[in-house]
Swiss-Prot record:
The name this protein goes by in its record: Tyrosine aminotransferase
Quaternary structure annotation from Swiss-Prot or TrEMBL: Homodimer.
Phylogenetic lineage: Eukaryota, Metazoa, Ecdysozoa, Nematoda, Chromadorea
GO biological process: biosynthetic process; dauer entry; L-phenylalanine catabolic process; tyrosine catabolic process
Organism name: Caenorhabditis elegans
Pathway of action: Amino-acid degradation; L-phenylalanine degradation; acetoacetate and fumarate from L-phenylalanine: step 2/6
UniProt entry keywords in alphabetical sequence: Aminotransferase, Pyridoxal phosphate, Transferase, Tyrosine catabolism
Function: Transaminase involved in tyrosine breakdown. Converts tyrosine to p-hydroxyphenylpyruvate. Has no transaminase activity towards phenylalanine. Plays protective role against oxidative stress, metabolizing meta-tyrosine and negatively regulating its accumulation. Plays a role in modulating the daf-2/insulin receptor-like transduction pathway through regulating tyrosine levels. Negatively regulates dauer formation. Plays a role in longevity.
Amino acid sequence: MQTLMSHSRITPLPGAITKEEIKNQLLVHERRFLSKPNRKDQWNVLPQSAHSKNTVNPVRKIADACAVPPHPEKKVIKLHLGDPSVGGKLPPSEIAVQAMHESVSSHMFDGYGPAVGALAAREAIVERYSSADNVFTADDVVLASGCSHALQMAIEAVANAGENILVPHPGFPLYSTLCRPHNIVDKPYKIDMTGEDVRIDLSYMATIIDDNTKAIIVNNPGNPTGGVFTKEHLEEILAFAHQYKLIIIADEIYGDLVYNGATFYPLASLSPKVPIITCDGIAKRWMVPGWRLGWLIIHNHFGVLTDVKNGIVALSQKIVGPCSLVQGALPKILRETPEDYFVYTRNVIETNANIVDSILADVPGMRVVKPKGAMYMMVNISRTAYGSDVSFCQNLIREESVFCLPGQAFSAPGYFRVVLTCGSEDMEEAALRIREFCYRNFNQHSDSEDSSDEGLDLSAMESD
């Protein structure tokens, strides 16, 4: 034992590393490791992607600005939601509900289907919408998760980063929301709401076209304008597109939801000369926006859209097709919904439009844009008489418990939008409250004539 102990205290050879030195080196390495920024014992905040950061719907900002408390003693009347199911006045047809029951109970549509959509559903679309003037086949149809998704696929298949698409102002703000994350420029063109019929200012549109312009989005009937383009004006639009060789993305979700003497003409039925991508769905005429089924019809004149069509098919694979259950119900919905259902819907909206128009017609500093289609009405207000459209809507909520959306949400400052889908009693009550609000708040010293479409000067406007 004595010998072993003496050996354990042998003096280290020259150049050997001592135990203390090893310990010190380990401490140095530990400090270096702990000082590294990528250490794994803590979580770093992960920033959102540029794509998601650029995905902004301006309606959300405006809606937040109007999140004020209503008058506590007055019934709330909601005229700001573009959802026809709200309020229960416009329910889906019994046929649509029955078709969904059958689709679910059959268990034939519980699994995946083709990404472009079930053949039977696409054939039903051909059966309903194809005509001698508008011939297409099931191979030209791609189903989508709502018309908004159809628009998204059309935009993404047509334009690249740095290129631009012409969008209507006033217009549906989602067009811009769909463009910007891809660095596609949404160029606004003017919608003229001053005449008997709403029109596109084609002279202005000609000034904003350049070599990077890929398409024109045409929304007819229009949201938020309630306008329906005449056949003559649609032919002018088509001639313009043909002259500049620009394809058209036709947003026709409101289709034949027209009234007050208007007629709806599907754009693709009027011209074999312009390639058109029609976007449509069941949300706003069958009153089921939550069922999320839309479609694209690719009218591939001259073969211009052959590659784009392939792109749309590829994009459909992102979601592997929309809800199979609704696809299963679609043939029955399209074929068997009675015409009386659509007549009832048009009558409800037309009655409401005429109620509001008659009650607000003589209000000073205000001009009603009488609608002929869709389910909306735009009302122009004098800024000097009532302030901005945002403050007008805020105060209308506070004082009258009536909810409307400011025109700024649709690139139309100086207006507010009224949704026309509630019952006629609520609509009349709301219009009377708006009138009383205006009489009570009208600035007697203002020039009420300044209510002339201030929202249509696009030169100083943001795109959203």
